[in-house]
Amino acid sequence: MKGLVRYMLHMDDPNKFKYQKEDMIVYGGVDVDELLKKTTTDRYKLIKEMIEFIDEQGIVEFKSLMDYAMKFKFDDWFPLLCDNSAYVIQEYIKSNRYKSDR
């Protein structure tokens, strides 16, 4: 079911128009938000992706990452940073900044 919802919204195809989940008509009490909720494995993959981005871009301020996530990664990085991964990412950025000052 989760794969079908992702397919219908074109979430995994960068070449197709992205539909909003709020516009999806559902039947039988299906909870789209619950189906699209990130698993622990998904969250760890996204955190890894953010850390790689931080290193590649030389990010030394949390605000820079939040601004990027809000503008370009609103559906995956932004909620993760707002809900439960900000601490580990902030500490990673802070340690990078401290390391580069030495």
Swiss-Prot record:
Record bears the keyword Flavoprotein: no
Single GO biological process annotation from the record: DNA replication
Domain of life assignment: Bacteria
Pfam families from the UniProt entry: Rep_OBD, RepB_C
Key words of the record: Plasmid
InterPro entries tied to this protein: Plasmid_rep_OBD, RepB_C
GO MF term list: DNA binding; DNA topoisomerase activity
Family in the record: Belongs to the Gram-positive plasmids replication protein type 2 family.
Protein name: Uncharacterized 12.4 kDa protein
Lineage: Bacteria, Bacillati, Bacillota, Bacilli, Bacillales
